[in-house]
């Protein structure tokens, strides 16, 4: 197997006397779909927050290839190609659909203040590329006809897809999805399943997924990590996890 794209070793996160994440280890290899699951309150989102710079871990290492991420600000981690969605949709609600995708690309535009003020050819070219990229992703998720609609007026499922597209216009290596199927109906969940598979298969994106929809998780994941009360419980293929007695007990509330 190739070198891990992301390696997490001994991750710890303490809030006062509460140990929210306790010695979590995980690896992501290029173009994998890996899920992080566990009962409510298991520490999954806290792990995401550590990986993406929202929290500074109390201990452990996070390596993107050979670059340490622990303690870096979220914006810098995003520029390095690690982006995320959230449990609750976080769009610029007063902006239009396409403006949300253009704003997301602002940090990727390799033009300085001088170029922007003078509208130099390089600035105009970068702006045109950003607009083309935004339109391409809106077409892919079926929202191109709503490009000029205010984001807050979209249906909930459309807002979820827009949030993923907002990540993808930045051309990330790793996309972390925090409960993307929450609140979706069965048809929307199936479309999400297909979209995640396409991101991996056709856009070379590595996916780390937190999700409570076990049908989605078991159907799409290459590997699964399980945490309970902040502590690693198991990891393996979907079949191995499905038949793991410790995992079964945790989900039945016996662990």
Swiss-Prot record:
Component of the leucine-specific transport system. GO terms for cellular component: ATP-binding cassette (ABC) transporter complex, substrate-binding subunit-containing; membrane; plasma membrane. The gene is livG. Residues 6-254 form the ABC transporter domain. Keywords: Amino-acid transport, ATP-binding, Nucleotide-binding, Transport. Gene3D superfamilies: P-loop containing nucleotide triphosphate hydrolases. CDD domains: ABC_Mj1267_LivG_branched. GO terms for biological process: branched-chain amino acid transport; D-alanine transmembrane transport; isoleucine transmembrane transport; L-alanine transport; L-isoleucine import across plasma membrane; L-valine import across plasma membrane; L-valine transmembrane transport; phenylalanine transport. Transmembrane segments: none annotated. InterPro entries: AAA+_ATPase, ABC_AA/LPS_Transport, ABC_transporter-like_ATP-bd, ABC_transporter-like_CS, BCA_ABC_TP_C, P-loop_NTPase. PANTHER family: CONSERVED COMPONENT OF ABC TRANSPORTER FOR NATURAL AMINO ACIDS-RELATED (PTHR45772), HIGH-AFFINITY BRANCHED-CHAIN AMINO ACID TRANSPORT ATP-BINDING PROTEIN LIVG (PTHR45772:SF11). NCBIfam families: PRK11300.1 (NF008449). Belongs to the ABC transporter superfamily. This is High-affinity branched-chain amino acid transport ATP-binding protein LivG. ATP binds at residues 38-45. One of its GO terms (molecular function) is L-leucine transmembrane transporter activity.
């Amino acid at each position: 197997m190739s070198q891990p794209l992301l390696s997490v070793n001994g991750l710890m996160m303490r809030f006062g006397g509460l140990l929210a994440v306790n010695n979590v280890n995980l690896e992501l290899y290029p173009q994998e779909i890996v899920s992080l699951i566990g009962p409510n309150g298991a520490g999954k989102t806290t792990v995401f927050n550590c990986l993406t710079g929202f929290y500074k871990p109390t201990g452990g290492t996070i390596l993107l290839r050979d670059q340490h991420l622990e303690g870096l600000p979220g914006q810098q981690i995003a520029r390095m190609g690690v982006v995320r969605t959230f449990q609750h949709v976080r769009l610029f609600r007063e902006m239009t659909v396409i403006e949300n995708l253009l704003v997301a690309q602002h940090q990727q535009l390799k033009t300085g203040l001088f170029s922007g003020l003078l509208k130099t050819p390089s600035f105009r070219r970068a702006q045109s590329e950003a607009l083309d990229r935004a339109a391409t992703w809106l077409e892919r998720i079926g929202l191109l006809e709503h490009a000029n609609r205010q984001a807050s007026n979209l249906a909930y499922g459309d807002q979820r897809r827009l949030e993923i597209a907002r990540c993808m216009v930045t051309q990330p290596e790793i996309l972390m999805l925090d409960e993307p199927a929450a609140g979706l109906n069965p048809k929307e969940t199936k479309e999400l399943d297909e979209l995640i598979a396409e991101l991996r298969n056709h856009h070379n994106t590595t996916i780390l997924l937190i999700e409570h929809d076990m049908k989605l998780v078991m159907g799409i994941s290459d590997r699964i990590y399980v945490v309970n009360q902040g502590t690693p419980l198991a990891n393996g293929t979907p079949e191995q996890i499905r038949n793991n007695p410790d995992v079964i007990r945790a989900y039945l509330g016996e662990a």
